[in-house]
Regions:
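C-terminal outer-membrane/trafficking sorting elements
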Residues: 21, 242, 653-739
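OB-fold single-stranded nucleic acid-binding module
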Residues: 23-206, 374, 379
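Proline-enriched interdomain boundary motifs that mark the N-terminal boundary
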Residues: 24-26, 206-215, 655-661
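Structural beta-strand segments of beta-rich domains
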Residues: 38-40, 129, 221-225, 668-672
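Surface-exposed, short loops/turns at beta-strand junctions within beta-sandwich domains
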Residues: 174, 263-271, 713-717
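Short, surface-exposed linear motifs at loops/turns and structural transition points
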Residues: 205-295
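HKD-type phospholipase D/PLD-like phosphodiesterase module
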Residues: 296-336, 350-515, 552-620, 624-625
Length: 739
């Protein structure tokens, strides 16, 4: 849409040249703007492959047409006279409603204008364009619906958008340099190309890469890069520690169509950039630049914590998975480990009623740790925890307004570049840093000790930060739709395969569906919401194939997708009945009870279009039987709670309490203190996690007065439950004893 100040001369000219419904050019129609009733003649440049919308073009310009009544009559190549009203739909001028359509038969399509990505603008809106020599970042993968794909032309980049129902869905994304034809469209000030079908991808003559670039066999000193070409040619790999590929090119001149090259002189725990090429008779086909990380020398352990009970049946060797009312203390303990660097991102942050995370961050800064902090700009007024940070700590708010939505990450990167590979830590998951999220809403945290993954998260952080030093640079920082798919996705951590995806650049939803569909026996999911029909379709496909699917969502009324999956899942679909809490998990488990590649999917990414295409999110996928068992146990306890249950859960939850017990991490229970908001007698009990009573006594609560629980006995290291009972309530809190 253009904003024009129409001069009196222009208005008089247009009025004189045509009546309101007299035939005018498309350029003249666009000048009249929204709400104008117009009639013009042009050529339809697309058919049903783009859905109901049609685009029409004449020698002066183009316009979109949206009409369920006339769409079936308008096909690619039709010459038509059309009448209707111009509207502004999210920045795109389109005719809606259409009042008349008069066909004049088939004609030749206009020649597309040859442009570059930066030239996609208002002047080309709704017109056919051609961009020569573009390379898709996701080349070799397959197209999915309702998804944008980035392509580059030299230093410039833009996107194509593939709608649901497009004939491109399931087709291979072109690899290497091609010429792209499509319609220049706009959505909320973002100009994009709409490719109609595979004929819009023009492959140059000569040798061409025809497969994805596979990077596998990750080792501490290298990896194997493989691809295929349509003709036999050379095998060339150009690589480096930066996108400049400064380490040079290695090649094998033996002509083959199945190419494989192993790099074996690389450094452990490093991120590398690589480009594959094949040449024949002077022609060269090159891939986009790919990113991968070598295996690190880290110990490679993985831990998960839940702020609610988990099923402990036959789990005598389980780690302490349930960290009820303790995730804040655990986070602080990890922050306290930082020796050199600490990068933090958080969506929602308030220290009220939790241990002060800000104090731990400040302490890290005061002991010489470089601290960088990113939070969501939309939450600036309520993220009170950021106000508790030292003024010297650099902070960056994500941009707001326009096409930006939310920075929804909740990750922490500790000592990513430490010379000791056993120091780097990544903390992430679904948990925000607030009382509600830590102590009430069901959530999880997953922690990795791995240098390659830590450097990957640092790379993502610095894309948003805009620099590699302590000062953010907003002139080059990228959030949301601006971000690029520029991080490794495959890792080997402690011998386990791990995948990592960041939204919205990495098309996480496509990976989610792909991972779901690997299930052979069972899937359990716990997710706050599902608003995408392609995920619902995947669930239906699994059930039709005999996979047992069980799921838990927060709210059945928030999406019509619920109607679809409830029909196929029946009583295996659970809904959070407690409106006082949010079932905030975003995880699923695949084949946890079999040997068929057990998988856990978790992170901050909700199962929605905004999460996939707009929000800043992160996702981890762990292929491991033990980790899958942890999440299966968490899911089972959420959907089959123990009654009575005085901890965070779905069917019973302590949402408010007149009693506070602190701290939750002590060397002995006698160090615990208690504060009450009422004056009344109470009983106090200390039990172990098997229910054995270790202490049972009485005390008098005093409003606002801190009471010492010095009467509690000494115990061995482990988890225990402190319960306080009054005449009308029971309060319980887990504590951890560590000597």
């Amino acid at each position: 849409m253009r904003n024009f100040t129409h001069s009196l001369f222009l208005l008089l000219f247009l009025t004189a040249s045509s009546s309101v419904f007299g035939q005018i050019t498309i350029a003249e129609a666009r000048l009249l703007g929204a709400n104008a009733n117009v009639t013009f003649r042009g050529v339809i440049t697309n058919g049903s492959e783009l859905g109901l919308i049609r685009y029409i073009q004449d020698a002066t310009g183009g316009l979109a047409i949206y009409s369920s009544n006339f769409a079936g009559q308008l096909n690619r190549g039709d010459s038509v006279e059309i009448s209707g009203t111009i509207v502004d739909y999210n920045g795109l001028f389109e005719l809606n409603p259409v009042t008349a359509s008069n066909p004049f038969g088939l004609t030749t399509l206009p020649n597309p204008q040859v442009v570059t990505p930066l030239q996609l603008n208002e002047d080309l809106e709704s017109e056919l364009v051609r961009l020569n020599g573009v390379v898709f970042a996701d080349g070799g993968n397959t197209f999915a619906g309702n998804t944008s794909y980035t392509f580059t032309q030299g230093a410039e980049q833009a996107t194509i958008y593939v709608r649901n129902g497009s004939p491109l869905i399931g087709q291979i994304i072109p690899v290497g340099s091609i010429d792209l034809v499509g319609i220049c469209s706009q959505y909320n000030a973002i100009y994009q190309v709409l490719a109609r079908d595979t004929n819009d991808f023009i492959v140059p003559p000569g040798i061409n890469i025809i497969s994805t670039i596979n990077i596998n066999n990750l080792q501490t000193n290298g990896a194997t890069i493989s691809w295929e070409t349509d003709l036999a040619g050379t095998t060339e790999v150009t690589y480096g520690l930066t996108p400049l590929l400064e380490l040079g090119t290695l090649s094998d001149n033996n002509p083959v169509t199945a190419h494989s090259f192993t790099l074996n002189t690389l450094l452990p725990g490093q991120i590398y950039y690589v480009q594959a090429s094949s040449s024949l008779n002077g022609d060269t086909s090159s891939s986009s630049i790919q990113v991968f990380g070598t295996q690190s020398l880290s110990a490679g352990w993985i831990k998960s914590y839940f702020n609610h009970d988990v099923d402990t049946t036959n789990g005598s060797t389980l780690p302490e998975l349930a960290q009820i009312n303790m995730l804040d203390d655990s986070l602080i303990a990890y922050i306290n480990r930082a020796e050199q660097t600490l990068d933090l991102t958080i969506y929602d942050f308030d220290n009220a009623s939790i241990s002060s995370v800000s104090d731990a961050i400040n302490a890290a800064y005061n002991r010489g740790v470089r601290v960088r902090f990113i939070s969501d700009g939309n939450q600036a007024a309520t993220n009170l925890g950021t106000l508790d940070l030292l003024p010297a700590i650099p902070q960056l708010l994500s941009p707001v307004g326009g096409n930006f939505t939310i920075m929804h990450n909740k990750f922490v990167v500790i000592d990513a570049d430490h010379e000791d590979p056993n120091k780097p830590i990544v903390w992430t998951g679904s948990t925000n840093w607030t009382d509600r999220q830590i102590n009430r809403d069901p959530n999880n945290v997953i922690i990795f000790q791995d240098q390659t993954l830590a450097r990957t998260y640092k790379l993502e952080f610095e894309e948003m930060w805009g620099s590699t030093n302590e000062n953010a640079d907003t002139t080059v920082s990228r959030f949301g739709f601006e971000k690029q798919d520029n991080t490794p996705h495959e890792f080997v951590i402690g011998g386990k395969r791990v995948e990592c995806y960041f939204s919205p650049s990495d098309n996480t939803n496509q990976e989610l569906i792909k991972t779901l569909l690997t299930a052979n026996d069972s899937v359990q999911f716990a997710t706050m919401l599902i608003t995408r029909y392609d995920i619902a379709n995947a669930i239906d496909t699994l059930i039709a194939n005999g996979v047992i699917v069980s799921g838990l969502i927060d709210d059945a009324t928030s999406t019509t997708v619920f109607t679809q999956i409830s029909a196929s899942m029946g009583n295996q679909l659970f809904v959070n009945p407690d409106t006082n809490i949010i079932m905030h998990h975003k995880f699923f488990v695949v084949d946890a009870e079999t040997e068929n590649d057990p998988i856990v999917w978790t992170g901050s990414h909700n199962w929605s279009s905004n999460a996939n295409t707009k929000n800043d999110e992160n996702t981890l996928v762990v292929h491991d039987a033990e980790v899958a068992d942890w999440y299966r146990r968490a899911y089972f306890r959420l959907t089959h709670p123990v009654i009575p249950d005085s901890t965070v859960g779905i069917l019973h939850l302590e949402s408010t309490s007149a009693v506070q017990v602190f701290p939750t991490l002590v060397n002995q229970p006698s160090a615990i203190q208690l504060v009450s908001s009422s004056n009344e007698p109470a009983s106090i009990q200390l039990t172990d996690m098997q229910g054995k009573i270790l202490y049972n006594g009485k005390l008098n609560l005093k409003k606002g007065q801190t009471l010492s629980l010095s009467m509690l006995p000494n115990v061995a290291d482990g988890l225990y439950l402190v319960s306080v009972r009054t005449s009308n309530s029971i309060f319980s809190k887990k504590i951890q004893v560590v000597n």
